[in-house]
Amino acid sequence: MQVAVIHTAFEDSPRTVASVDVDDNMKVNEALEYAYRWTNNVMGSWSRKEKTFDDGTENGDYNDAVTVMAPLNEGGMGLRSTSMGDQMLLGTTKYKVAMCGFEAI
C-alpha cells in the first residue's frame, strides 16, 4: 500500500513530493501517521536520500520506504516537512493534515 504526500499548505499549486510504502496491515490512521513522520525533517532530511551526510553525521530521517517525487531545492537543500494543510492520498481517499490528525476531504 502507498501513501502519496502532496504539499499544498504553502505552495501556489499542489505538488506531490513523496510516495511512502506502508504495510498493507496498517489501519488508515497508522498509515497516514507513518507517512507524516517520514516526510518530516526531525533528525536530518527525509528527502535527501543519504544515510550519512558529507560531514559523517547520520541522517536520522532516511527511510527506504520513502520515494521522493519532487526535485530538491536549489543547492541540494531538502524539501520542507509535511505540515498542517498538506494532503495525503491513500487509495482513492484524500486526507488533509489537520491540527490534530487527519480529515478526509
List each language-model region with its residue ranges.
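N-terminal non-globular leader segments, chiefly Sec-dependent signal peptides
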Residues: M1-Y62
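Feature targets compositionally biased, intrinsically disordered low-complexity regions
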Residues: M43, D55, N59, E74-M77, ...
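Short alpha-helix capping/helix-loop boundary micro-motifs
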Residues: A65-S81
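Short, compact, well-ordered microdomains
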Residues: M77-I105
